[in-house]
């Protein structure tokens, strides 16, 4: 079956945009084909610094004919409805429609629309120009004489050529006939910008890939990454060194070269006095190079790996020397930052925080630090931390924001603060908290273990959440510019993974200047939503989470989790499943009878009347009283498994009651009391969760 080959060659595409652009191209083209009824066997997109490419395999040469019956308005309908029908169906008059009789709805018009199958080549020529002209680049530009025209082509960098061919493997493919702003699709492309700039012709995908390889272009980004990684490791191994792997940098560098050539440079040992993280940040950020460490050690080596886009005649000596000069200059700057920063204590830097605006509505970093310090001291006893150390750590936590090193490399905030604090004789826990209070910064990041770090981390995140809730800057949909979901998840993970007992409502009380109760309740609801997401990711059932959160006062996240776990384990047993079924039956009966009677059956049942009734009625009343008391005591003791065991003993009497007892008895008093017994079952289960929220 025929294949499509599409290449869009331009000047350099920023590395960070390449993968997304390739996937966008694939989705836009394949979606447009499927929308028009053209299915395909497979599609794969590619990106290099100078081209996007797409291969769609197994397309039909021609689309199938389509016959559609479109129902119109009733015969005799208003003229406007008839004209709308004719227009939508592409008919000139009602003479071109047929009339169909429906036994229930009468006569109505029917249009039979037949569309002959179209040539795939024609369809491609129709859809590709629009996709190219409306391509969703994050940033784009216009260029040349055409840029003055309204609606002219926008591309990430000037588009230079388009390859678009279509045809089967056994025949010469055809060029898809279209052009965009004077660039006409053809079969001609070119290779590496410096190594093989001459144009050459390509026909189909296999030829295209091989021709690019001969022209020093490796089309597949993953293959470029693999070459870089393995060559870098081999080069390091040959020198007795290990590569410090960096997936983000590897992805970026693979997007900077079409023909990767791995080289190694070096710098003077004296620069190793700088913290390893600063060396790595300097070499990574400024030169896009990988650092190396001594084999079998965490200690950095005075060497680095660089990736060139050229096969140099001198073996890369000049390229390496040029990179070494720049790296030395950058490391000299980093060394100056390091020495300059060490000369000033973190505490002496605090006044500068008063001139840094955190948010225009939330004051300065200095004001924020004061709030975090007070909250950290309050949280400290709850997490077994020293309040004085927690307050001290919070006071210094943001001081490194005004250091030279963090000013140059913001990604080192916290880490450099820890190093400066340690050099200045601060307590180990204080120094650790300065770095760790930002954690966790992502789902794979670890939660702090030191109690002081935990106290400051919680205070920092809670202050952030309270502040943005106070000014009504909450996350909406997919937008979360201040990473408030991440902050809430950080609090949740710290509480759960470190088994912390905290009442969020108590910690939030009085934090809001106005509307305290409403804002606190709204923020607690946000925590509940985030906890649901977290627990779902851990495999918990969403309905069980809802069932626990439906109970009042659920602001102790650790207890919520333990209750959900116990409830899940209970409902996985036969006793749990049968009790849930019994609950559902009781709740359904109550709902029907309460609606019919216009009243709620929510008082306690008459024990004497139940005792004088049928044996199963008496047994259920006794079991409910005992189970509710036992479950309540177990919940109070935080023994949720024990509470579930208490409920499990209701299974047999509930089953027997429904089997032998008629709830809607003729005697009104007896009927009422039996409905109250069912309400007692509802109340007993509510000791542990709202069973009405549980599916099944």
UniProtKB/Swiss-Prot annotation:
Q: Which keywords does this chain's UniProt record carry?
A: Aminoacyl-tRNA synthetase, ATP-binding, Cytoplasm, Ligase, Nucleotide-binding, Protein biosynthesis
Return the broad EC class: ligase
Which reaction is recorded as catalysed by this protein? tRNA(Gly) + glycine + ATP = glycyl-tRNA(Gly) + AMP + diphosphate
Q: Which Gene3D superfamilies match?
A: Isoleucyl-tRNA Synthetase, Domain 1
One GO term of the biological process aspect: arginyl-tRNA aminoacylation
EC numbers listed for it are 6.1.1.14
Where is this chain's protein located in or outside the cell? Answer: Cytoplasm
Predominant localisation class: cytoplasm
> Which InterPro entries does this chain map to?
DALR_anticod-bd (IPR008909), Gly-tRNA-synth_bsu (IPR015944), Gly-tRNA-synth_heterodimer (IPR006194)
Q: Which GO terms describe its molecular function?
A: arginine-tRNA ligase activity; ATP binding; glycine-tRNA ligase activity
Give the record's GO CC terms: cytosol
Determine the domain of life of the protein's source: Bacteria
For this protein, the record's PANTHER family field holds: GLYCINE--TRNA LIGASE, CHLOROPLASTIC_MITOCHONDRIAL 2, GLYCYL-TRNA SYNTHETASE
Complexes and interactors:
Tetramer of two alpha and two beta subunits.
Q: Which family does it belong to?
A: Belongs to the class-II aminoacyl-tRNA synthetase family.
Q: Report the protein name in the record.
A: Glycine--tRNA ligase beta subunit
Q: Which organism is it from?
A: Methylorubrum extorquens (strain CM4 / NCIMB 13688)
